[in-house]
Each structure stands twice: as structure tokens, then as C-alpha cells.
Swiss-Prot record:
Residues 305-340, 345-380 form the EF-hand domain. The lineage of its organism: Eukaryota, Viridiplantae, Streptophyta, Embryophyta, Tracheophyta. GO terms for cellular component: plasma membrane; vacuolar membrane. It comes from the Eukaryota. The gene is NCL1. It comes from Oryza sativa subsp. japonica. This is Sodium/calcium exchanger NCL1. GO terms for biological process: calcium ion transmembrane transport; intracellular calcium ion homeostasis; sodium ion transport. May function as a sodium/calcium exchanger (NCX) and participate in the maintenance of calcium homeostasis. May play a role abiotic stress responses.
């Protein structure tokens, strides 16, 4: 029988740490006698002990002359302090609670998605729940207190916004490349599960599918609200700043809605893309079949279609020598071609071929129509496959292999169906419970965490932006970061694509939903928009990484160095602009 491990008592430790930052001093009733030790001994009721966190008072100085630093307890009972170590402890404690809140929200969201499947749940609810901890921290950073206090604390919210975006696109992105790297093959694509080249900066890396590039482009579009809000500052004018904030606010939430709707209807988009990929694979199969039958080269040396070979293929398919191709003859052609276990409806394939070739609408394909259609197919193949100038027989083989790869990637996505779960009622209850628990923890401790960061900034004289930029994203994004790293370590194109899509999706929600909450706070409380350096680093990182990831699908190992360097560069840029050039 396993012995139970005794845990260290947590409550005494907390009390000890809190008490270590304080000391006692005598508070008199105002009479001179009460200040002496004799009076204290003779009249113990006339003096009491008060705990204070002020370090400026001394034992010999009168109480009235000692300046007091005060801290305000959150909800009237949570601990507070004005010391550096005390506030550091509170930042770590509240940050850990926000991490647990994010973990509960993530677990509940995944469980709910497993039960109910994609659609409204996966497309609308889950992206919002994933961004909830960050959104709450941004909201409470300027919600309470006077306008001056809110203007001071709202910098914490901007630090979290910038820090989360930069963290995801630099440290997390680079780490996923490192743990997910595979050997890059001769075709420039990472080979699944093959990692024999060590840490070669150019010979290893990761590959993603084209849909991941689309997610990166959406992420790039999500910076538009930042540009709108910053536009008056770019023109060096104070006129229209409030209008710019309102316009950016509207655009932010419009982008959130558009992104969620895109997520909702993505299954239909995937089905449409899958049908198109199957059709392209049929085209490439017919082209390859023509070459395998030794009818000749379909393309001349200069890349133009070889009409003589195309006509030979037509007459070979025309079994009854009627000078036309019927549906039955096209169906026989499809059956005779080995499509390497690609599952599709052959009648549907015949329909699509007929649609491509039968321009006259008489439900048969004449020789001229066949030649014209084959030319279109060959031109499509030439656009899809890069060549070195010479169009050899290998060109058609490469095109067929590429269409097969596109088909397989989309089949993987279309196979993401909802599996039946045991006891769905209990699973739904558990999922809702996790979501409520995570939301409650995030809502309860967001404000104390912001206060602790603000107090730590005052005590340590470190700007609150840098604290929130570095520390808060670790608290709110650690759960997703660990999951992303574990998923990327499976070293497959499929898992890498899903991992980086999630990263880009997280940045998109930061730049839309969380920014929208921040802009609403600025507008409603009539705060000043003065975040030029912060907006600059967000634009810098998003534009560089967005352009970098939008137009390529393979990333060698050296690209992680670029991502890693952007993180300290962002901090240096903010420091120089704010404290050297005085932007803020």
C-alpha cells in the first residue's frame, strides 16, 4: 500500500511570509505618559500594537511625524503590503491562481468541444473563453479608482496586451519550432518523425499546411484597430483622438464577430476545399495515366501542350470509335486509373470531368473539347508545380504527388468528427463546472493581481508596463503554451499545423477581443490614449512574423533565432522610446 505524502502546511507559510514584511509599533491614546514603558506596564489598555508596513519610522521618532504608506485591501480582506518582497509574493500567488483559471477554462472548453463538436461551440464560444483571463485583466486595470488612478493602472492592461502578443509570436513560436523540428527533405518539406540531422539550422525545421498560412494572414489583419487608434498620434495631432478610439473599438469587435463566424463556417469551407482537392487529384491521375501508357510527352520542351499526344489519348479512351467520349467511357477511364486508395465518388468525378470538357452541353465530349480541356488542365499543373525550365515526365509525377498531399491534408481535417462519449450528461456537467470555476477564479483575482502589480511597481520603482509585459502573459498563457509545445513535439506536419494555427488564433483574439475591451475602457472612462511605443512593438512583431508566416509553409531551424531575438528587441525599443526619447 502506498504511503501518503505529507504536504507542507501552506497556511502557516503564508502567514509567516506576510508577517515577515511587517513590524509592530506602539500607538498611544495621545497622553505623554502613554508613550513610556512605565505607563504601558501600569496601563496596558491605553496602548495597542498596530502592524505597519512603513519602513520610514523609527523607535525614537514620534508617531505623528512618521509618514505612512498605505495599501488598500482587495474586497476588504485579501492581504496587501507596500514592500517589494511582499508584493512579489502576491504577484506570484495571484498569478498562479490566474494560471489555474486559464487551465480550468481550457480543460472545460476542450471537453465541451469533444461532446458538442464544432460549429457554434467551437467557433464562437471557445475563442472567447480562451481570451477571457486576458480580457478580464485588461478590464480591471482601469475599471476602479479615480480617473488619475485608472490612467496610471491602465498601463498594466496595455503591458499585458503587448506582452501576450509578443510572447506567443516569439518565445512560444520559436520553442515550437525547436521541439517540432524534423529533417527537411529534397522537396523542401519536413519529413514526419525523421530527425537525423541534429540541430542543423538549414537542414531541419517544421512544415505546416496552407490553411495555417491563412490563419497567419488573418492575424496580420487583426492589427488594423491598433493603426486606427494610433492614427492621430501618427499625424501628431490631438484632434479626433477620441473619435479614433471609438472607431477602433467598433472595428475590433467587428473583427471578433467576423473571426468567430469564420470559425463557425469553417467546416463547410473545408468540405468545399476537400472536393476541389479530389477533383485536382483526378486531373493529375489522368495526366499521369497518359504518360504511363507511353503515348508520349504531354508537354513540349517549351512547356506548350503537345496536341498530338492529347489526341492519341482521346482515341485510346474512345473505345467505340465514335469520335466522342461518353460518360461510360470516362467512367471506365476513372476505374482503370490507380488512385492510390483515395476514396471518392467515381460518378461525381465523371460529372466534374464532363463539366470541364463538355462546353457544348450535349453530354458528350468531342475531340476538340477534349484537347481544349486537357490544355487547361496542363496549364493548371504548370502553375501548381515549380519547374527548373525543362518540362520532363517527372513534372506530371510531381504534380500528381502534390495533389495527393493536398488531398491527404484536407482528409485529415475532415475526419475530425465528434466521437460518442460515455455518459454525456455527466461530461457536460463537468465541462460547465470547469468553465464556471475558471471564470469565477479569473473574475475574482484579476483585480487583486492588477493591484499587486501596481504596488510592486511602486515599491521597486520598475515601470508597471515591464512587469505586466513579462509576468502576466506567463500566468495567462502558460496552459496553452505547455499544450502547444507538447503537441508540436510529436514532429508531424499535421500537429505542427494545428499548433501554429492555435498560436495565430490566440494572437488574433488578443488583437481584437482584448484590445476591444481595452479601447472600451479608454473611451468610457475618457482616458488618454498615449501608448505609441507599446503599439509600435505590437505592430513590429505582428507584421514581421505575419509576413514571414503568411507566404511560406516550411520554417528551417534558424527561423527560431529570429523569433527569439524579437522578444528582447521589443523591450529595448520600448525602453529607448519611453525613457530616452520621452514618447510616453
Amino acid at each position: 500500500m502506498a504511503t501518503r505524502r505529507r504536504s507542507f502546511p501552506l497556511v502557516p507559510l503564508l502567514l509567516f511570509l506576510l508577517a515577515a514584511a511587517a513590524y509592530g509599533r506602539l500607538i498611544s491614546d495621545g497622553s505623554p505618559a502613554s508613550a513610556s514603558a512605565t505607563s504601558l506596564l501600569s496601563n496596558p489598555v491605553s496602548a495597542v500594537i498596530r502592524l505597519t508596513t512603513s519602513n520610514s519610522a523609527s523607535a525614537s521618532s514620534p508617531p505623528a511625524a512618521a509618514p505612512e504608506e498605505k495599501c488598500e485591501q482587495s474586497y476588504g480582506f485579501l492581504p496587501c503590503t507596500t514592500t517589494v518582497l511582499g508584493n512579489l509574493f502576491l504577484v506570484l500567488a495571484y498569478g498562479f491562481l490566474m494560471y489555474k483559471a486559464a487551465t480550468f477554462l481550457s480543460a472545460g472548453s476542450e471537453l465541451l468541444l469533444e461532446i458538442m463538436g464544432p460549429g457554434l461551440v467551437g467557433g464562437l464560444l471557445l475563442p472567447i473563453l480562451g481570451a477571457l483571463p486576458d480580457a478580464l485583466l485588461v478590464l480591471v486595470s482601469g475599471l476602479s479608482g479615480s480617473r488619475e488612478t485608472a490612467q496610471s493602472q491602465v498601463l498594466i492592461g496595455m503591458g499585458l496586451l503587448a506582452g501576450s502578443t509578443v510572447f506567443l509570436l516569439t518565445l512560444l513560436w520559436g520553442t515550437c519550432v525547436v521541439v517540432g523540428k524534423c529533417d527537411i527533405g529534397p522537396n523542401g518539406v519536413a519529413v514526419d518523425l525523421q530527425n537525423n540531422k541534429g540541430f542543423s539550422l538549414t537542414g531541419t525545421g517544421i512544415s505546416t499546411d496552407v490553411q495555417t498560412s491563412y490563419a497567419a494572414r488573418i492575424m496580420g489583419i487583426s492589427v488594423i484597430p491598433f493603426i486606427i487608434a494610433q492614427f492621430p498620434k501618427m499625424l501628431k495631432t490631438h484632434h479626433g483622438q477620441r473619435l479614433a478610439v471609438l472607431l477602433a473599438l467598433i472595428v475590433s469587435f467587428s473583427l471578433v464577430l467576423a473571426y468567430c463566424l469564420y470559425q463557425v463556417f469553417q467546416p463547410w469551407i473545408q468540405k468545399r476545399k476537400l472536393a476541389y482537392a479530389k477533383h485536382k487529384h483526378v486531373i493529375s491521375g489522368i495526366l499521369r495515366h497518359a504518360q504511363m501508357e507511353a503515348l508520349g510527352r504531354l508537354l513540349n520542351e517549351d512547356g506548350t501542350p503537345n496536341e498530338d499526344v492529347i489526341k492519341k489519348l482521346f482515341h485510346k479512351i474512345d473505345m467505340d470509335e465514335s469520335q466522342t467520349l461518353s460518360r461510360a467511357e470516362l467512367h471506365a477511364l476513372i476505374i482503370g486509373i490507380n488512385f492510390e486508395e483515395v476514396d471518392f465518388d467515381k460518378n461525381d468525378a465523371v460529372d466534374k470531368i464532363m463539366d470541364d470538357f463538355d462546353t457544348s452541353g450535349n453530354d458528350i465530349v468531342e475531340e476538340a473539347e477534349f484537347v481544349s480541356g486537357m490544355k487547361r488542365w496542363l496549364n493548371e499543373a504548370k502553375r501548381s508545380v515549380p519547374t527548373s525550365g525543362a518540362y520532363s515526365n517527372k513534372f506530371i509525377t510531381d504534380y500528381h504527388a502534390r495533389t495527393r498531399q493536398e488531398h491527404d491534408l484536407l482528409v485529415d481535417r475532415s475526419d475530425e468528427t465528434v466521437e460518442s462519449v460515455e455518459n454525456p450528461g455527466w461530461c457536460i456537467t463537468k465541462a460547465v463546472g470547469l468553465l464556471l470555476l475558471g471564470s469565477a477564479i479569473a473574475a475574482a483575482f484579476a483585480d487583486p493581481l492588477v493591484d499587486a502589480v501596481h504596488n510592486f511597481s511602486n515599491a521597486s520603482h520598475i515601470p508597471s508596463f515591464f512587469i505586466s509585459f513579462i509576468a502576466l502573459p506567463l500566468a495567462t498563457n502558460s496552459s496553452e503554451a505547455v499544450s502547444a509545445i507538447i503537441f508540436a513535439s510529436r514532429k508531424k506536419l499535421r500537429t505542427s499545423s494545428l499548433t501554429f494555427s492555435e498560436v495565430y488564433g490566440g494572437v488574433t483574439m488578443n488583437n481584437t477581443l482584448c484590445l476591444g475591451v481595452f479601447l472600451a475602457l479608454i473611451y468610457i472612462r475618457n482616458l488618454t490614449w498615449d501608448f505609441s511605443s507599446e503599439v509600435l512593438i505590437i505592430l513590429l512583431v505582428c507584421v514581421i512574423m505575419g509576413l514571414f508566416t503568411s507566404f511560406r509553409t516550411t520554417f528551417p531551424l534558424w527561423t527560431c533565432l529570429v523569433a527569439y531575438m524579437l522578444y528582447p528587441l521589443s523591450l529595448v525599443v520600448v525602453y529607448i522610446l519611453d525613457f530616452v526619447f520621452g514618447w510616453s
